[in-house]
Amino acid sequence: MKQATFSEVTEKVRETVFRSPLADRLSGISVDENDDELGGEFLRVVLEVKGLNTFKLDQMTPLVQSIEDAVAEIDERFASVRLAEAA
């Protein structure tokens, strides 16, 4: 299984996010390595959004897909992208 280092994955996610026209709506990004219930590994990507009520969720779909595609180029683990309202 092709796996990039944690820092490579994090950098790839950051590059993808900051190229997005929605970058100004985000206040943070976190990437964590996780295990599923079946013993498989995946990457949890959390995008901290400045205000979940300031846009429609479908506006984030292209960014989520871009992150999933970018991670897939360097790592075979699935990138599970989630949104969270920034504190």
Place the predicted regions along the sequence by residue.
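Short edge beta-strands and adjacent turn/loop segments
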Residues: A23-E48
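N-proximal, solvent-exposed amphipathic alpha-helical segments enriched in charged/polar residues
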Residues: M1-D32, T61
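A short interface-forming secondary-structure element
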Residues: R44-P62
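A short amphipathic beta-strand at an alpha->beta junction
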Residues: D69-A87
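Residues that cap or initiate secondary-structure elements
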Residues: D35-E37, G51-N53, A87
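Short, charged/polar micro-motifs that form catalytic or ligand-binding hotspots
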Residues: Q3, N53, L57, A84
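Low-complexity, intrinsically disordered Gly/Pro/Thr-rich segments
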Residues: L63-D69
